[in-house]
Amino acid sequence: MTIAPTTLLLFAATALAELVGCYLPYLWLRKGGSVWLLLPTALSLAVFVWLLSLHPEASGRVYAAYGGVYIASALLWLWWVDGVTPTRWDLLGAACCLLGMAVIMFSPRSA
């Protein structure tokens, strides 16, 4: 596997861990879920941090680029979990963010 697909898969897994880690407390606080949801929340957020640490790039660059993937993933979550269809403006915004992520992560670097 080349660096680009590996990076994208790692970003996608990271976004899923973060979204789950944020959604479970939402279920507890806003939807009457059990306080026990905080246990998988802690695990999910620990996995999120661990996944972010696996990238070979400088942390600031990884965090900046990951933001674009997170935005696109959050819109997929909006659609698949919340049942709300993203607007064309949502999709255009996510596409811009993903383009920014690609520029940040995959542009040539000096040695």
Swiss-Prot record:
Statement: the UniProt record of this protein carries the keyword Cell inner membrane: yes
Intracellular or extracellular location(s): Cell inner membrane
Species annotation: Xanthomonas axonopodis pv. citri (strain 306)
Keyword terms, alphabetized: Cell inner membrane, Cell membrane, Membrane, Transmembrane, Transmembrane helix
Alphabetical list of Pfam families matching this protein: UPF0060 (PF02694)
Residues spanning the membrane: 8-28, 32-52, 64-84, 91-111
Protein's UniProt name: UPF0060 membrane protein XAC3064
Upper taxonomic lineage: Bacteria, Pseudomonadati, Pseudomonadota, Gammaproteobacteria, Lysobacterales
Family to which the UniProt record says this protein belongs: Belongs to the UPF0060 family.
Membrane topology: Multi-pass membrane protein
GO CC term (a single one): plasma membrane
